């Protein structure tokens, strides 16, 4: 019978069942999707919560609890980075002091974690102490943290004695811990079982095995992981580890092995751990009989162990392990070295003392008793204690934990964070087994390091890999090795003395990129039976595929990789127009692909601030192909006009269709208020009622002779309410709206001096205008000149000015009548703003006609040119998408993103907020922020004052962690447009 769903007891009771991965959402600090609710969760309880049954001996329990709480601590911790089965998290748990003199705290292994750990503990009197991990068991769910005992000055820390032999069925117990994120909660229960198999928390996560678990009904929830399970005398008989998500059942780890490990630490002895890579399961005698246990063997076992109900049976045997081919699944364990076996406890005792030795193992298989001699392996040797960061991804040696889940050999290179160049899937970041890189085998981590050393930067290489959940399927992929943005190539090694992971740089700089050579490509014309459309056949020669890699989550752009199509607007000089959905900013690596054959790098040279397109430049000398720029029309499309659509659909397949323009509309793409980013504004868009066109992210509208009338672009819009998906809009941008820029590009001139009105306008009906005060004489004037739709333009939003700029005189609700003496009918009538320092408007405001002069804003300052990485937060000046949605900017230090597991995450720096002060020193911009943090030492608490996106101020404290999250900057050279990394030496 399968186990019922089980869960860990971490910070907020997040359920980790046997069909889903662990979900760590700390009640201490809200996760990214919770950030809009505030900075920190409220600690609603400063007083102990006594949730226990009142019995006749309640006075005894009261005395016991009074002593126990002085040894129990709340652990606030973070797993800094992905490693092995665990992802980077911030969470909260419980531990208890087991050696007050040495400052040793016992907690769960899934709290200590297999990888980098940072944390502190809070005692009952709210004294705080930094802790470091000194031991995490390779298999069983326990580990030890250590604090400086001298740092606790205002209370006498007591320690709990570990008494595993006092755990009996029927024993009344208390679980004393940080239940459901409360400071202290005391839960009552009775032990109901001592021989439960270890709970299963699912694949690709940590699981305990080869040990009995104690079962009780205490209804513990999140944050209670690591709580002591004490008896009436105040002895710790077990440690809280997990529980059922469908019942009040809790699972406790017996403290036999923690007690042994504690004694080894106290005696400065190594904690040896032996194993033969076999998972055993405790099965009742009736099932053992069905699997081949003889009646005589059962009789002997029942006589030897009258209180036991079964024996250990091999559940799985790992290939290439010490017991491979010697023990089979279904074998019943009888004895080890002539020692009869009935419990996991005895197996652990024997194996832990026999590492490297050969032992005689007796099993029963199919009614036959078999004796095997097996060499005992070292569990620590198959537990990874190092990882490699390179090209934005992280790798470690295959672990026993992962291998056991899928019954595979404990060997190979495991990708614990498939990001950067090794991002195979947006949804699956872990579980990948790397087999070859650049056609070279990578059987282990050291070989992988040597292979990566030989790969030049910007090189495309072929890799093969599998996912451990589907080892039958080998995947092959060409990836781009990027090491100029993410230059880190380092080895991290665990140091149990310091509690840190020591970093060693493997290669300061990658090998330089290989020289590019010209390559041939052949375009195949679009086949048409209709002779009248033969002019459109060669339009395929104007399309190029554009692949974008955005290494830094700048400007709140949600994607790292994008693929779309652009149109060559100048084949002689090498210019491509593409949607800003695919090229959001200029901190990108761009690849331009011709005829799906030739791949050359591109560079962003122009980003239009309103109209949702970017211009990319490539070197035309590197492409030996018949690349053609189309002929561009000088007449705008009109409603009802027929055209021919050529575009690329979701599958990047070329499609065509005859279409009719359904409308020309003045509009703005809806904003993503919870995550502001670039969007098209003040657009005059071509609309089509075509299902096929709405399936295409890129394309063109053309006349039958091939003359281009409109670019078909995709526009990134608002997020759905669940913040998991983004809305995309697909509309046309008339060629005439781009002709001025295209003509400049033909002269190799980049329009860097573009200016805009920093406001958004929307169309309103004549009726709305009349109601809001537009006089009849102006309505008559509009009726004379409007030939398609009668409408006014009204101010919908006014962007917040920068701190050194004068506020825009336009106000929301202003109705535009004329600009520089000409009537404003559509968005196109505002095009004169692009080269004017100011514009003279006649407007209606509050039913009054007035004249105002509105200065325009130069657009080069709208693009981000400075990014700061500090304590896991990514900071920049508020980008244009932010200012468009705000009336006033609190500071020009904007938190655009934060890394999971960093101080920013742990202490509650919220994305989309502004840092206004550091230690009460004002930080108006990034330069003043850098000045404020320069003299702040590592592992130091600092006070930050922040203002949320909704202008709610808050003050928090953040502890710096420069070891794992060093300070760095990226700055753009305004002359060359190149980005340069600036590293900072921390104090």
Swiss-Prot record:
Record-annotated active site: 110 (charge relay system), 141 (charge relay system), 224 (charge relay system)
One Gene Ontology molecular-function label: serine-type endopeptidase activity
Gene3D superfamilies, per the entry: 2.30.42.10, 2.40.10.120, Trypsin-like serine proteases
InterPro entries with a match to the protein in the record: PDZ (IPR001478), PDZ-like_dom (IPR025926), PDZ_6 (IPR041489), PDZ_sf (IPR036034), Peptidase_S1_PA (IPR009003), Peptidase_S1_PA_chymotrypsin (IPR043504), Peptidase_S1C (IPR001940)
Cellular location(s): Nucleus
Biased composition (Polar residues): 11-28
Stored Pfam families: PDZ_1, PDZ_6, Trypsin_2
Annotated ranges, domain PDZ: 279-364, 878-950
GO annotations of cellular component type: nucleus
GO biological process assignments: apoptotic process; cellular response to heat; lipid metabolic process; stress-induced homeostatically regulated protein degradation pathway
Domain of life: Eukaryota
Family to which this protein belongs: Belongs to the peptidase S1C family.
Name the UniProt record assigns to this protein: Pro-apoptotic serine protease NMA111
Annotated organism of origin: Debaryomyces hansenii (strain ATCC 36239 / CBS 767 / BCRC 21394 / JCM 1990 / NBRC 0083 / IGC 2968)
